[in-house]
Amino acid sequence: MKRLFGRVVAEYAEFLFYAWDDERQEVIGVGHAIPAAWDGDRATLPDGGFDAAMEARFAPEPSAPTVLCALGITIAPEHRGQGLSRRMIERMAEIGRDHGLDTLIAPVRPTLKHRYPLTPIDRYLSWRRPDGTHLDPWLRTHERLGADIVKVASKSVIVTGTVAKWEEWTEMALPESGVYVVPGALVPIEIDRERDEGVYVEPNVWMVHPPLRVTEP
């Protein structure tokens, strides 16, 4: 996937954008997206989520794009919680509209899911605050912009590596085969020492934003 993501940056730079802090003269946010083909049927959104969106776009004969698929928004820690994420999503949707792609879809990575790695993602999605808004702040931000939670992308990101690599990445000893909860992961990883392999299969959440239309003055 790292190879394909490099192609996203190189071949779809028009869908890459930044948030800039004039006072500090530095980038404080980055957003990237990719055109995608989707027929509007919620059932056809792929379980592969993030990975599937890139694989489909770089297939030998990709289908003509009909929507814009968000791949990620990253905001500097000191600028989080100030409304920038909302503005970044809105800007992403505007860029899509400017290229004839009025609908934004997103395989969203829930911000707080890593605190509940043993909770099934479907159950996590049912958690709401007393005011009815979603417990997860990133899902909540998308919902406030009109997006619907459509389905779970159960295999959105798959990461494999040797046991040694996983011990390096997690800064943990993984002495035997089995399932481990590791820092930052939304779900546990699975270690197979006989095969010298660790696998992480991350679920994300497909969300669909309503078509963005131009408002006449």
Predicted regions and their residues:
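C-terminal/domain-terminus segments
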Residues: L4, R87-I95, H99, V152-V187, ...
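A short helix-loop-beta-strand connector motif used in the catalytic cores of GNAT acetyltransferases and
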Residues: R7-Y18, A36-R42, H134, G198-V205
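Conserved acetyl-CoA-binding loop-helix of GNAT-fold acetyltransferases
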Residues: I75, G81-D98, T103-A106
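Conserved beta-strand in the GNAT
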Residues: Y18, Q25-P35, C69, T74, ...
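Conserved acetyl-CoA-binding loop of GNAT-fold acetyltransferases
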Residues: E143-K151
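ATP phosphate-binding glycine-rich loop and adjacent ATP-lid/helix-beta elements
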Residues: L139
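Conserved acyl-donor/pantetheine-binding loop and adjacent beta-alpha core of acyl/acetyltransferases
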Residues: G31-G72, P110-L135, A153-E197
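Short, basic/aromatic recognition patches
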Residues: M1-R7
